[in-house]
């Protein structure tokens, strides 16, 4: 029983909901949750249980996922969950190359052997897609290397964000995409500091190549200072 309990505890620590659960315990109650790179909506489904009163917006680049995401949204009545189909980036562009894969679709092509299809999609900025978001906001960006581009395209909307979750790479998994060191610098410049890590992904030989990092705004009471133990 102790072994099972230890495994469950380890899984809770490594899952994004574990990080957010700890933030909830510290009093974090977002008014808005942005799920950028929503894919099948599973992240929104699980996090909605943590923050039932929040308005959720799922943004996904692949139009083929719209119906699946709509089913997720309809499970929460009252218009609390919205679905938007859009490829987000740092600028407005009529056409950009996009590599369609089962779970790793991206502007930045994966350096893997998994099958993909090259297409072109229009790109927009988040601050063109949404005019405002209620604070405090939680923003999760999981877009296979385009995280900083999406953040740049958020413009003044970032001012409402208290907690950010970004997929961060420590190896060149997506060709030309920023790696962890650049992400940390850019996020500090934007006013955010690391809080937690979750969802570690390993490749051949157990090599860690990316994980989700949770950031909170500088000076936030969510990030403790002083005596920690």
Predicted features along the sequence, with ranges:
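Phosphate/nucleotide-binding beta-alpha loop and adjacent structural elements of enzyme active sites
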Residues: 1-229
